[in-house]
UniProtKB/Swiss-Prot annotation:
GO MF term (any one): RNA binding
Gene Ontology process terms (BP): regulation of translation
Family label: Belongs to the AEP2 family.
Main location: mitochondrion
Species this chain originates from: Candida glabrata (strain ATCC 2001 / BCRC 20586 / JCM 3761 / NBRC 0622 / NRRL Y-65 / CBS 138) (Yeast)
First and last residues of the transit peptide: 1-27
GO-annotated cellular components: mitochondrion
Assembly and oligomerization: Binds to the 5'UTR of the OLI1 mRNA.
Function (record text): Required for translation of the mitochondrial OLI1 transcript coding for the mitochondrial ATP synthase subunit 9.
Name of the featured protein: ATPase expression protein 2, mitochondrial
Pfam families named among the record's database cross-references: ATP13
Length: 548
């Protein structure tokens, strides 16, 4: 009988023609995909008898026999194809991508070669796009491959123009790429959308422009990505400029993030400032919290705080407390964070941002403010080149504003002890510029925030570290200022168990004895200096008396 050499792809082709399910060592049959134009898997060829006149049952047995003799790599490749065949599970293939990148790419290439519709492919990629932990190298590579297929399918079926489905999907790709710090890939996705608008004869800022694309344009082209800002922290005393990132490691950094297009930014600003609600019945797309947040960040990045002030006055009229805002725009924590960041970058101080945030709290009740807002304030305060005493005072003002907001929202009482925020406060407090009056602030932090940790059934490692840091710091400062009785009262009140109380008491005794000994030594040394000076003066008087 004549022999014929076939590969894996031929097996799929044969199975499809004969309507025979192909099996491997995994559960269930392999879905029979259409023949692709290229060899799907590069495997060693295997020999089977010519089967043009063989019964279907016998043929199925022969194919199964050949599959059982394949290498482990071949079996894994077939497993990937079967995984894809089950409900078109692209999300499951994501887990294999790091193990066998090439095989996974070959597997998903089947979809494009099988002429799947853009609607079907969109449905298949949603579980992948909706995952929130896609930040690794292989995750980004997998997303990039899916995006390339998506773009190719869109050009094939839609001629390159984009509809509402394409806009939504591509903006999800952009969001994930930004989260994974893949700006080049995000720019590719954005450019595809912009080309799609052009293909339809539409303008991004026209009536068919969508909020997501405008927001991502401002992030990628106009400076709204705050995490990538280079912050100049040099002052008049520094000859060399130093740059930090707000969420970086507070070291000199280099960044290629620059403004690529400010034209559309200022078009939006002009439209906002010239808009007259009397002439229009509907609120324009730019009067959206997400877009306004990014516009304000962009203006802060390019140093246009005057325009930020104009926009705030136009929309919210903060100086007129009794006048309600004209427009139905929710003031969110992210919007307030953008305002503070924009002013901080331009003015090298959080002071203007604190003033504006206070005005918002006074005019608009029950603003929901997330911990990220307060954390962002403290980060700016630490980074900016203020005198350290000024940094302490501004940090204290942030704390007072936090308490004031808490009371204004009818949620008065305790402030949840956020570990990241309080660690930043501790960094400010642990400087050498703490004064006696600052002890009241430290005690206030215990009373209104750290107290929430004492009511928890169990504490995390980070919470225990935070609590002990504040306990030890407070005891050190109390001993330093000579408040021994208050220190003992503090230990009694704020130790969380017997062992902690004993540790703090032992620390107090050691520190007190050390400071007493040091002060005693200094007093003795000072008395020696005084006595020596007195003796020298006596000798001088005796000499002068003898001469006269």
């Amino acid at each position: 009988m004549r022999k014929q050499v076939i590969g894996i792809n031929n097996i799929f082709h044969l199975a499809r023609i004969r309507s025979i399910p192909v099996h491997c060592h995994c559960k269930g049959p392999l879905y029979s995909y259409p023949v692709v134009s290229k060899t799907l898997f590069h495997t060693k060829n295997v020999e089977v008898s010519k089967y043009s006149h063989v019964e279907l049952r016998s043929l199925n047995e022969q194919i199964h026999s050949q599959l059982t003799s394949l290498t482990d790599l071949n079996k894994r490749q077939l497993l990937l194809v079967e995984t894809l065949s089950r409900n078109n599970n692209l999300e499951k293939l994501l887990d294999y991508y790091e193990i066998d990148e090439g095989s996974v790419e070959d597997a998903i290439q089947l979809l494009q070669d099988s002429n799947v519709s853009i609607q079907e492919f969109s449905s298949m990629i949603q579980p992948v796009l909706n995952r929130t932990n896609l930040v690794g190298k292989y995750h980004m590579g997998y997303l990039s491959k899916l995006m390339q297929i998506y773009i190719s399918l869109t050009r094939t079926h839609n001629g390159g123009s984009v509809d509402a489905l394409n806009k939504d999907d591509m903006n999800k790709f952009i969001k994930r790429f930004i989260e994974g710090s893949q700006l080049k890939r995000a720019q590719t996705a954005l450019q595809f959308l912009l080309d799609g608008y052009k293909e339809r004869g539409e303008d991004l800022l026209g009536p068919y422009g969508d909020k997501q694309t405008i927001a991502h344009f401002l992030m990628l082209r106009s400076g709204a990505l705050q995490d990538l800002w280079k912050i100049d922290v040099s002052n008049g005393n520094n000859k060399k400029q130093a740059f930090y990132k707000i969420n970086g490691s507070h070291r000199n950094v280099k960044s290629t993030y620059n403004v690529l297009d400010s034209v559309k930014l200022f078009e939006i600003v002009r439209y906002i400032l010239r808009y007259n609600d009397k002439d229009n019945h509907s609120q324009p797309v730019y009067f959206d919290e997400g877009i306004l947040k990014n516009v304000i960040l962009c203006l802060g990045y390019v140093g246009q705080t005057t325009l930020i002030e104009d926009i705030i006055n136009k929309i919210w009229e903060l100086d007129s407390v009794s006048v309600p805002p004209k427009y139905n725009i929710t003031v969110t924590s992210d919007l307030l964070t953008a305002i503070v960041s924009a002013y901080s970058k331009c003015g090298k101080s959080i002071q203007p941002g604190l003033v504006i945030a206070d005005k918002f709290f006074g005019k608009i009740p029950n603003i929901i403010v997330k911990d990220d807002f307060w954390i962002n304030l403290q980060k700016w305060n630490i980074i900016l080149p203020n005198k350290w005493r000024s940094t302490i005072d501004l940090s204290k003002r942030t704390w007072e504003l936090m308490k004031s907001w808490r009371n204004s929202t009818n949620n008065g009482g305790f402030i949840t002890a956020n570990v990241e925020f309080l660690n930043l406060v501790y960094k400010v407090l642990s400087s050498d510029y703490i004064k006696l009056k600052d002890l009241e602030w430290i005690y206030d932090i215990f009373q209104h925030s750290l107290v929430t940790l004492y009511s928890k059934n169990s504490l995390t490692v980070d919470e225990i570290k935070l609590l002990k840091k504040f306990q030890i710091f407070t005891i050190k400062k109390m001993v330093y200022f000579g408040h021994y009785s208050k220190c003992l009262q503090f230990i009694k009140e704020w130790s969380y168990d017997a062992a902690n109380k004993q540790q703090l008491t032992n620390l107090f005794v050691v520190l007190r004895n050390r400071y007493l000994q040091k002060r005693g030594y200094n007093q003795e040394k000072e008395m020696t200096k005084v006595q020596k000076k007195y003796d020298e003066e006596e000798q001088e008087d005796m000499l002068l008396g003898g001469l006269w």
